Amino acid sequence: MELPLFAILQRTPRVAITLAFVLFVLTIVPALYTLLADPILPPSISSFETDHTRLSHLNSSSNQIPSPVNGSIPTPPYHTPSKHRKSSFHRIPKPKKGPISSPTDHIPLRQRSSSFDQIPSPMNSPVPAPPHRNSSADQSPSPVNGPIPAPLNHTSLRHLNSSSDDHSSPVTTSPSRTRIRDDEQMCDLFTGEWVPNEEAPYYTNTTCWAIHEHQNCMKYGRPDTGFMRWRWKPESCDLPIFDPQEFLEMVRGKAMGFVGDSISRNQVQSLLCLLSRVEYPEDISPSPDTDFKVWNYTSYNFTLHVMWSPFLVKATKPDPKSNFFSLYLDEYDTKWTSQLDQLDYLVISSGHWFSRPVIFYENQQISGCQYCALPNTTELPLTYGYRKALRISLKAIIENFKGLAFLRSFSPQHFEGGAWNEGGDCVRTQPYRRNETIPEADLKVHDIQREEFRAAEEDGMKKSGLRLKLMDTTQAMLLRPDGHPGRYGHLQNPNVTLRNDCIHWCLPGPIDTLNDILLQMMKTDN
């Protein structure tokens, strides 16, 4: 008689126990083996151990990461953790291959293609407190190469649609992620707004040797740093931040010249500072004359010429008995025009010196004067001399230059509360908004530049195929009353009255943007 299996097990307990043990072994042992071979841990613990293991490995290699303060692992503020990870610990990005060598005391070059390579902010170091100074408004730095030029026919700012205190900041886009595409070459670079840029500045007064004393605002105690943290944002595109390696590759084996006054030299100092993150130049100037300098970047065989010509045309300094400059409005200043055949790029600018007392000569005869009050001499306006001088200078470029030329427009001054010699100062700490306008005299000089440029551009294309471009930066710089040295271009001395400098620009500062625009225009031309 056959019995069911459960009946057999009831009668023979030992068989039941043995069978149960076999089933237990066959079920549990494989599971234990899987668990021991590949443990399943909570995601946060797994992520922590992965990052911790990587950090331990890096610390044991030759490329050690400096130990963080208090033994904590810093979270890079610029790194966004992977959306697939649930850990709060951020991976440290791998270094890029082939970093650009830079001077050891300089900020390394920022690779704009990645959001990882943000330049450390030099503003983490304490800003020196301004020394004790007289509160008088008529202090100012000693100007470069002579007295600060007399003001243009300055009028107060005309407020169109808002007050000057409206400094609301628009939403900013990281300059490291935006570039002007090929199909945006016709973008108007010169109409736009200043937007915050927390990545700036890209050099400091301690890392760049080229900053002139009178533009070294932080050295002389300027208490605010916000003026360094803006970038120019055109309306219909984004302007890339200046890339020094890209610039040097573009000008490899070539020569560039800057012609003009101390604002032109101010821009050159900015360019030298921006390029110093890649290479220091060698001074190969043929003479000790500081008005004519030549630097060479040996790794790129690039030469940079700076030529002092504040009037652009032939001029003679006043004799001891006179305060009048003599301007020969129909004669070239051969100190720079004779160098044109050696250059591939040219940046020409001027304006401020034309507000000085001058006597005009044409055809070797006195044709008039400005601010002279001489008997039997026609008093002529500023616009007369400037138009004539700019016209003949552009003619010299058309006839003697075969490269790419830029006419940089007038850089405005921002005296408030009086003229340069009447206690005027520039104490604003934020940019103007675009709906605030400019002094009328600045508009006159700017209008002349635009008119003469159009005529020269047409003439140059007909005669020689000259590539002449207008770098119309007046609006951008007009909106930056906060960018001047003011009283912070010299030591503060309560016993000495010095005038404020509201003409030149602090370095680093807004004038760095001129080189952003210069590089972009060079790229567009190519």
From Swiss-Prot:
Pfam families: PC-Esterase, PMR5N. A motif (GDS motif) lies at residues 260-262. The keyword Transmembrane helix applies. GO terms for molecular function: O-acetyltransferase activity. Residues 57-73, 133-143, 153-163 have a biased composition (Polar residues). A motif (DCXHWCLPGXXDXWN motif) lies at residues 501-515. It is a single-pass type II membrane protein. Residues 81-97 have a biased composition (Basic residues). The chain crosses the membrane at residues 15-35. It is found in: Membrane. Residues 57-183 are annotated as: Disordered. InterPro entries: TBL, TBL_C, TBL_N. The keyword Electron transport does not apply. Keywords: Membrane, Signal-anchor, Transmembrane, Transmembrane helix. GO terms for cellular component: membrane. Belongs to the PC-esterase family. TBL subfamily. Contains 2 motifs that are conserved in esterases, but it is unlikely that this protein belongs to the catalytically active pectin esterases. May act as a bridging protein that binds pectin and other cell wall polysaccharides. Probably involved in maintaining esterification of pectins. May be involved in the specific O-acetylation of cell wall polymers. This is Protein trichome birefringence-like 21.
